[in-house]
Amino acid sequence: MTQPTLFIDRDGTLIDEPKTDFQIDSLEKLKLERNVIPALLKLKDHYRFVMVSNQDGLGTSSFPQETFDKPHNAMMELFRSQGIEFDEVLICPHKPEDNCDCRKPKTKLLQKYIDRELFDPATSFVIGDRATDVQLAENLGIRALQYHPEKLNWDLIAEKLLGEAVTNIGDRQPRYAEVVRKTKETDIKVQVWLDETGVNDIKTGVGFFDHMLDQIATHGGFRMNISCKGDLWIDEHHTVEDTALALGTALKQAIGDKRGIARFGFVLPMDECQAQCAMDLSGRPFIKFKAEFKRDKVGDFSTELTEHFFQSIAFTMLATLHIKAKGDNDHHKIESLFKVFGRTLRQAIRIEGNELPSSKGVL
């Protein structure tokens, strides 16, 4: 039966993965990831759970089966005692050099689910902490949620997936947009996946700016790719401005008709710099920006372009934006502005129902 399914990684996602030898081979090493049980309890009525794990060299002298079984069985019994059942537990015992067909991100372990169409591609996800989990999702034609204990933990995953399950987002088109912008000064391509998380591929030629853009996606709870070839032999002005315009357009397109979104976001404070942001996806562009910088540049990024970036993205998103920061370190102030923008955007684009969040009936 086709149904929403979560293909969940084990080590580093459900349970902590030791950084010393990357093996859970004793009860002493068994430690659940924070709030994984409450999250799975919230999700179990909406999704089928399938555990998919690579266990390098399982059954060999480097990782005997019996040393794996004891903590694994204890983990499974703990989940069962709390009302959490997995449809299957699928394990690849091979090492990368074995070149098998079942090691993630390859899909042979899940061949039954593929052949019998047992999962709904529109409402199923891979959840895991590694890039191979994201690649597995791509190979299956579904979305990925790349687990991180801070940036995308189990509380945030449950919040995201419950929103989808309750509003039956599977009947909607995926919130994705691609924008290509070419001028005499820049050649830009932006891709945005609002309902996915994972590795962001951002290359603008301005290192500090790349890092700031990554903060927006990471704290916004979505995934994006940005490539920009700009006239950096002059300066970075056109690169920053045109990237903001293209990103704002992509976000606006991905959000779509705004039906069901929260619309508003408000965050304060953030980090030691006391960054604050309020946002309304109102269709009426406006910005009020307040931050002062002592330095002309942070790395290869002109500090004066910070305000210009947020002005450009607010006007192309058609958003009302109030954003400010205060502090002593210019690097930290700029980074906190991008982070708080991402966190506020996360609130505003969150799906909460099916109604248009406006008394006027239009946004």
From Swiss-Prot:
Q: Does the keyword Magnesium apply?
A: yes
Coiled coil spans: none
Q: Which UniProt keywords apply?
A: Amino-acid biosynthesis, Cytoplasm, Histidine biosynthesis, Hydrolase, Lyase, Magnesium, Metal-binding, Multifunctional enzyme, Zinc
| Named cofactor requirement(s) | Mg(2+); Zn(2+)
The biological processes this protein is annotated with in GO are:
L-histidine biosynthetic process
Q: What is its EC number?
A: 3.1.3.15, 4.2.1.19
What single Pfam family name could you report for this chain, choosing any that match?
Hydrolase_like
Annotated segments matching region Histidinol-phosphatase: 1-174
Annotated residues that bind Zn(2+) are located at 92, 94, 100, 102
Q: Which family does it belong to?
A: In the N-terminal section; belongs to the histidinol-phosphatase family.
Protein name as catalogued = Histidine biosynthesis bifunctional protein HisB
Q: Which species expresses this protein natively? A: Actinobacillus pleuropneumoniae serotype 5b (strain L20)
